[in-house]
Amino acid sequence: TLIKKAGKATTNIHKRAVQLIQKNGMKAKVYIITGLPGETDKSIEATKQFVLDLKPDKWICLLFTPYPGTPIFRNPDAYGVKILHKRFREYVQSYPSKSHVNLYEKETGKLLARNKDLEARFEDLYHWLNKLNPESMEYSSFNG
């Protein structure tokens, strides 16, 4: 998966970190990223279950964006990503939007971004999270 290729931590590590933070009287904020290559309705449901198990105090829901200067931006083919914009000024760091990336599945070449399935999965997760606990939302890249 993209997360493994990018060298990101596993869900078990994230869960343990949130538990330790909360156990020590601090608030845990999690970043939930959707729109990764290979994402499916099933993986969104798994993300929802993970959030239920995690019980974060705050959450931020973002659409995957390979920012200029990152390893994914510099080598998109290795991660199954196609870059839509090449200049950093075309990205809004704090609030990435659905128009910033053009993702495709490497194996099939199927376009994902600006695809109704991708947007529907993102909006489904965003609205589910907001319904779960609206006070927990700090901000999101959802703009519709």
Feature annotation, model-predicted:
Residues 1-143:
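A structural motif corresponding to the C-terminal lobe/cap of the Radical SAM core domain
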